[in-house]
């Protein structure tokens, strides 16, 4: 539901409106007042200096930015050549896992690998991030790119990313759409978290019951086991061959 909601609202908006054909070939139509352009006119790619004591950040396939343990700048050899700086609020686009939705706005200062495009945006970063994720959910990246390994899309070239087409409304409407999608995402994530917690509690309860029975903490000597009747499953009879000799004999007897 989350992916379908994102895909719908970033291409249709919140209100019903007149639609028009689009030059973006993976979209059938867009709201008539929306503009179309290439990403390079909305995003600016940066090569930032690495902050002191920067933590290594991962632009994950789950669509968020995570800290990678205790990996510090001082523990990484030749880090100036390998990594790049990230500022809180930067839009990150993973050049190899774009197809899987590895696109996110960083909540941290830190550093990341150069395969990730670190960008700022002159529009709503949240709207653009959701739009780019929509392209992953609808498999656009897989259709327009050949990965260098299985299950990848190769967007390491910034020119390839910069020339992707996007349709977008006014900045105010972008923020409204992003706010609405944020609400859906938060609601779904809370629901999933609640279910995961309930499942974990049931697993713990099951393990506790088993352990209590095995250790004797629960006395099961007087537990009544209900009677049941064992029913042996019969093997299915083999179907007779059509046109067998027995069938022919029966036919001849009927004719006689």
Segments from the language model and where they lie:
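Amphipathic alpha-helical coiled-coil/heptad-repeat segments
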Residues: 1-17, 168-256
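Sequence-specific dsDNA recognition surfaces
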Residues: 23-24, 37-88, 234, 240-256
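Ligand-binding loop in jelly-roll beta-barrel domains
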Residues: 120-125
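A short glycine-rich beta-alpha junction/loop motif
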Residues: 96, 110-115, 149-175
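Short, ligand-facing micro-motifs at secondary-structure edges
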Residues: 49-72, 91-115, 126, 130, ...
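Short helix-capping and inter-helix turn/linker motifs at the boundaries of alpha-helical repeat units
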Residues: 15-18, 106, 151-156, 200
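Non-catalytic DNA-recognition/assembly elements of restriction-modification systems
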Residues: 21-51, 167, 171, 175, ...
């Amino acid at each position: 539901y989350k992916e379908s909601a994102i895909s719908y609202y970033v291409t249709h908006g919140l209100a019903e409106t007149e639609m028009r054909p689009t030059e973006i070939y993976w979209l059938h139509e867009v709201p008539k007042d929306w503009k179309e352009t290439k990403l390079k006119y909305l995003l600016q790619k940066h090569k930032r200096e690495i902050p002191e004591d920067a933590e290594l950040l991962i632009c994950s396939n789950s669509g968020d930015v995570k800290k990678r343990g205790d990996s510090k700048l001082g523990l990484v050899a030749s880090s100036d050549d390998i990594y790049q700086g990230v500022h809180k609020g930067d839009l990150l686009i993973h050049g190899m896992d774009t197809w899987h939705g590895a696109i996110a706005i960083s909540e941290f200062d830190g550093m990341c690998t150069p395969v990730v495009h670190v960008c700022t945006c002159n529009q709503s970063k949240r709207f653009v991030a959701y739009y780019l994720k929509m392209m992953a959910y609808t498999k656009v990246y897989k259709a327009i790119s050949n990965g260098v390994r299985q299950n990848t899309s190769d967007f390491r070239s910034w020119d390839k990313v910069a020339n992707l087409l996007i349709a977008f409304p006014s900045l105010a409407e972008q923020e409204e759409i992003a706010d609405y999608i944020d609400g859906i995402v938060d609601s779904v994530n809370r629901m999933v978290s609640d279910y995961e917690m309930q499942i974990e509690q049931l697993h713990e309860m099951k393990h506790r019951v088993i352990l209590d029975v095995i250790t004797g903490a629960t006395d099961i000597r007087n537990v009544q086991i209900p009677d049941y009747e064992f029913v042996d499953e019969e093997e299915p009879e083999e179907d007779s061959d059509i046109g067998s000799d027995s069938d022919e004999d029966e036919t001849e007897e009927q004719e006689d």
